């Protein structure tokens, strides 16, 4: 999740840019850079590492004269962290410079076209493609050029752009990636988020999708993609700086839960093309996919729970046997890895010690490895044979939410890809699954919009000492993650059990008033899990059920029911986890444990 700032006004730009970037450090980054027009040319400084490196290089901006500029903190998506891959990026003669937050899905196609026209690339980024595209179409009119490029780019982006021959203008663009505009007596600003501008103004404009703004020293001009001028009204921000960093949410965990629809979409959309699953980074031919005889999924914590879900889906769709291992166990048990085995390593950071050790063990044994990670250039990303990135952005809260959700998406896509290549899924079923996946971001948003209902229920159980989660099949995997969320942020003892195992000892722990959370998203298990609910009700338990809309039978036995939008049952985890995340969050803050979700 990159940070963008831009400024034009009466003050020296570089110190303003550096100050704004410092207010966006909470978003996470691996490099930083700024570009300033000094009255003659555009000067640029950028460096890998903390913002402090850039501040020292420029003497806190003093070495870069000029009152117009743009800046950027980068969270790597295309290309590892490096000075060359850091933003801003120039065109060939340094007359156009760009900063970018987002993902250009068709950048390889655009890059190939530009290279055929003689353009040379210095970095591995998708952003450099934008700079050269602007150069290719530039006709002296920045607005017309920007709209031409917008029509040809696919994906999400927020852009800040300088044109050397328009020295008194800064341009900014938004499509599916946030960007705000601020106005003050000393100048006008753009930024990815409110904290970057609060020192200068509390009056901001929120750009909508496919809108463009031209900033001058005297004013702002807004346009749509058809170059029609728009009238917009500012919003006055009342938040303090701490609240602004959290986007107006009380805690980072709540903010990150609300970022899940976008994170899921960002991970999903680039890999669905023309109704098919396209995983270019997989690095496996169809013949190699068909040759895979066994899959191991190795991870820790919440990532392990996504692997448990993926096991059910891989085996159901692709008919490949799958083992799921905790990395801390896998690395020490001398696992038997037959020829034609694929080991999938899942980690948000790409640096989890046990998971990294498991990867190295798999490589020592000579089997193919695939990393599913969130951090570009991390150890697992570098050492795995191939890597599939989740585009969750940085997580600040203790408990993972959006990284978990994007890891699920990556593994759904992987299972579907394998099933399609191996011929174990019909075209009709495959098409229906694509449609279900594409609806998930909107459905997650809908569930988040009803968070107050979960909060009211959570407030009734703040004094709970023991909570049990139950489910069958994929629902058991969901229960494991729901239980972990509750215990790690509320300090309440919580356990997840396969519902069919209750009778083997666990039922003796169910007492009058004990809270049981039952997950029922798999139609083939509805009756059996309802029977399990009846068992715990007989012993005096209070039951919260999470189920799919239409399963009204559960109302007869559960005390409280959360209904999920209809989806393909194999993807239900992505929806069922939302109320369980919210439940853990609201119990935690209700018990005064704000530090664990901040």
Model-derived segments and their meaning:
Residues 1-246, 250, 262-293, 332, ...:
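Conserved short alpha-helical segments that host acidic/polar catalytic motifs at enzyme active sites
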Residues 4, 36, 98, 161, ...:
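Structural beta-sheet core signal
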Residues 67, 71-84, 273-286, 310-346, ...:
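Glycine-rich oxoanion-binding loops at beta->alpha junctions
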Residues 290-432, 436-439, 519-562, 583:
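Glycine-rich phosphate-binding loops that contact phosphosugars or nucleotide phosphates
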């Amino acid at each position: 999740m990159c940070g963008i700032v831009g400024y034009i006004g009466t003050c020296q730009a570089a110190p303003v840019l550096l100050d704004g970037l410092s207010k966006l450090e909470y978003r996470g980054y691996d490099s930083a850079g700024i570009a300033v027009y000094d009255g003659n040319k555009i000067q640029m400084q950028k460096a890998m590492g903390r913002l402090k490196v850039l501040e020292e290089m420029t003497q806190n901006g003093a070495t870069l004269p000029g009152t117009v500029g743009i800046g950027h903190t980068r969270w790597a998506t295309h290309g590892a962290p490096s000075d060359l891959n850091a933003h801003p990026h120039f065109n060939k003669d340094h007359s156009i410079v760009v900063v970018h937050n987002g993902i250009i899905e068709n950048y390889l196609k655009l890059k190939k076209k530009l290279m055929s026209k003689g353009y040379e690339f210095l970095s591995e980024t998708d952003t450099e493609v934008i700079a050269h595209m602007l150069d290719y179409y530039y006709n002296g009119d920045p607005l017309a050029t920007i709209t031409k490029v917008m029509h040809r780019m696919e994906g999400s982006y927020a852009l800040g752009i300088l044109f050397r021959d328009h020295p008194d203008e800064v341009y900014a663009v938004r499509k599916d990636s946030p960007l705000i505009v601020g106005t003050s007596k000393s100048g006008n600003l753009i930024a990815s988020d409110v904290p970057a501008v609060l020192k200068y103004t509390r009056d901001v404009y929120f750009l909508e999708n496919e809108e463009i703004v031209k900033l001058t020293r005297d004013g702002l001009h807004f346009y749509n993609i058809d170059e029609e001028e728009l009238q917009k009204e500012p919003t006055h921000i009342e938040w303090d700086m701490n609240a602004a960093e959290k986007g107006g949410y009380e805690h980072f965990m709540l903010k990150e839960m609300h970022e899940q629809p976008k994170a899921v979409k960002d991970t999903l959309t680039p890999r669905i093309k023309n109704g098919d699953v396209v995983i270019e980074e997989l690095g496996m031919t169809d013949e190699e996919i068909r040759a895979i005889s066994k899959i191991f999924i190795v991870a820790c914590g919440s990532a392990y729970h996504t692997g448990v879900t993926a096991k059910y889906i891989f085996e159901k769709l692709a008919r490949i046997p799958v083992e799921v291992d905790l990395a801390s166990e896998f690395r020490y048990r001398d696992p038997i890895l037959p020829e034609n085995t694929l080991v999938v390593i899942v980690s948000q950071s790409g640096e989890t010690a046990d998971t990294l050790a498991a990867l190295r063990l798999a490589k020592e044994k000579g089997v193919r490895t695939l990393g599913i990670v969130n951090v570009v250039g991390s150890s697992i990303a570098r050492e795995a044979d191939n890597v599939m990135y989740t585009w969750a952005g940085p997580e600040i809260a203790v408990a993972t939410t959006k990284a978990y959700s994007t890891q699920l998406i990556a593994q759904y896509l992987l299972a579907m890809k394998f099933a399609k290549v191996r011929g174990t899924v019909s075209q009709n079923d495959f098409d229906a699954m694509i449609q279900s996946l594409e609806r998930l971001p909107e459905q997650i948003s809908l569930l988040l919009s009803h968070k107050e209902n979960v909060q009211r229920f959570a407030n009734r159980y703040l004094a709970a000492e023991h909570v049990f989660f139950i489910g069958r099949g994929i629902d058991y995997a969901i229960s494991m993650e729901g239980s972990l969320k509750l215990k790690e942020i509320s300090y309440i003892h919580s356990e997840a059990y396969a519902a069919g195992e209750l009778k083997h000892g666990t039922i003796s722990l169910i007492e009058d008033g004990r809270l049981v959370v039952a997950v029922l998203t798999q139609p083939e298990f509805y009756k059996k899990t309802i029977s399990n609910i009846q068992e715990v009700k007989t012993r005096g338990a209070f039951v919260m059920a999470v189920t799919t809309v239409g399963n009204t039978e559960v109302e007869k036995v559960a005390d409280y029911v959360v209904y999920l939008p209809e989806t393909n049952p194999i993807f239900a985890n992505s929806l069922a986890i939302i109320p369980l995340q919210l439940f853990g969050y609201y119990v935690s803050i209700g018990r005064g444990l704000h530090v664990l979700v901040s």
